[in-house]
Amino acid sequence: MENEIKGFMDYLAGEKGASKNTQLSYERDINQLKKYLEEKGITDVTRVTRTVLNSYVLYLEKEGRATTTISRMLASIKAFFHYEFREGVIKKDPAELLKAPKIEKKTPVILSVDEVNRLLAQPEGKTPKEIRDKAMLELLYATGIRVSELIGLKLDDINMNIGFITCRDERKERTVPFGKTAKKAMESYLDSARTILCGDQEQDHLFVNCNGSVMSRQGFWKILKHYGSLAGIEVDITPHTLRHSFAAHLISSGADMHAVQTMLGHSDLATTQMYMGYRQHTSNR
């Protein structure tokens, strides 16, 4: 299957223009299937049947894989076999009718306004690290961007005069405004903390760790957990919790649904509409 997988990866990179992360995800998923098939004595893509793929799904479930993970893996597998069928490598697509396990939609954790205020108040701003932490938390809540977008921001992506950031990936970009509180925290970080944290390193990323390197997702996750604990927040919070809270609080305040959709970068309005329940809940209190 090596040649078939390589051909599919070339197709993703070329014709589809898939991002590096997407390519890596597909390649990882398909190689895991390849390993399973080889253990079953199947090395030829033409020998893969729907029964074999169904057995693979059962295997993943027994391994304790999350339904969301299995669904993602199956999406990669379906795309691969559809490509092989389209190219005439196989006469029948064994993944065409393959069904992913049903995913239970979990209600997102949304902090109250009071909880958010307590969280944002934790970094006292006495050290360069605390000044940076304050800026990251304020900007994340003020914009609702993803943590990957936050740590991916570069100096050129922020306009302090007008008050907006530009989030980019390989295929699209969007601008998101931020308010006075976040602007003040950002000014403090840029004026008095970032240079100290960078030290001798030249760094074009906006947020850096204490060694002057790019802040990692895990690094920010630890920062958030630390301040969440100090704030006495009992629910398990993640960087996405602030994104959920940003959206829910905006909508509960009467913000336009389409405007919130644009700021969040949701391609489907239905994804943004899930926060309507929070508005109805708060209006009844």
Q: Where are the regions a protein language model picked out?
A:
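Conserved catalytic core of the tyrosine transesterase superfamily
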Residues: 1-285
